[in-house]
Amino acid sequence: MVRRAQRSENDQLTGLKTGSSVTKGFAEGVRRGETHPEEFVIAEEVQEALRKGTPVVALESAIITHGMPYPINLELAQELEGIVRKGGAIPATTALVSGKIRVGLSKSELEMLARAKWVKKIGPRDIPVAVAMGFSGGTTVAASLHIADAAGIRVFVTGGIGGVHRGVSEVLDISQDLPVIGRARCITVCAGAKSILDLRNTLEYLETMSVLVLGYQTDTLPAFYVRDSGIPIEYRVDSASDIAAIVEARDRLNLDTGILVTNPIAETDQVDPAKHEKVLQAALKKAAEEQVEGKAMTPYILAYMQKNLPGVIEANIALIKSNVALGTQIATLLKHT
């Protein structure tokens, strides 16, 4: 059942734009087994699944390279792929490996990304540099979604998305995630925007980008580590089948509307909201003192919170597992022909 809740950078990916007829044609070519740019390497298992119409779920790799310490990051990456397989879909973790865009990683590649300290954090604007210079790195939400969309994958799962940063009136700091979510045909499943952000303005920006925000069994926007931000969202959806029906309706109508599914962390897994806000304010103050800014800000704040707020890593693991389970369920309900 679907009901209204009560409430008053860069477009290029090796020459492809998400949401465009070019990308759709590329994705169709992938499914037919035709050639694609040599820098765009789709694992054989993933390519076969796309050709046969087997559900595929895309996963990011920045959480492996920059989100958690080793070996927790590697264990989590392997477990997430296992959840996808158990749910009846094929996992496709995205990354840059030696200048190649990878859709689906081997065990050795996951190990390398989890262990290496020198790998980059790669957003959409960084992809051409990484390809040209032969870099390896973890792909952000925006870059992962670009890649998944270009490959013809219909569901992408992450922990939390980026958004509008606090103090945006002083520094115009808005994540690349938001416009990419707005353009992509591939839907994004997450636990809301990261709680370190300006969540109200993030929701407003998503509306400006014509993103349909769905609350999975919730009337309010989830806030990553915290279950309830208190900010109402317009559409509550109580089943994966309803989400799949909405996606199919959008696609039949050929609407250029991104879809963001927000899945709140379980109440038993969330961190204490009051303690969270106290530690967050301390982290923001320290970041300002050390002049941390740009794409370094989110990893800095999250690392500070992991160190100073008990239960953060456990909450992060719990929420992304829940998101992957939901995303896999949605993927298996969608048509993949």
Question: Predicted regions span which residues?
Answer:
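Solvent-exposed alpha-helices and their adjacent loops that cap or buttress functional pockets
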Residues: 48-51, 56-57, 146-150, 155-157, ...
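Short Gly/Ser/Thr- and charged-rich N-terminal loops/segments
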Residues: 6, 17, 25-30, 60
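General beta-strand structural signal in soluble alpha/beta enzymes
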Residues: 57-59, 91-96, 137, 155-160, ...
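N-terminal glycine-rich anion-binding loops that anchor highly charged ligand groups
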Residues: 48-61, 69, 87-95, 295-300
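Active-site glycine-rich loop that binds ribose-phosphate moieties when present
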Residues: 138-141, 169-182, 187-207, 240-245
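Anionic-ligand binding region
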Residues: 227-251
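A C-terminal functional module that forms or caps the active site or interfaces directly
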Residues: 257-319
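Glycine-rich nucleotide/cofactor/substrate-binding loop typically near the N-terminus or early
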Residues: 61, 66-68, 74-130, 252-268, ...
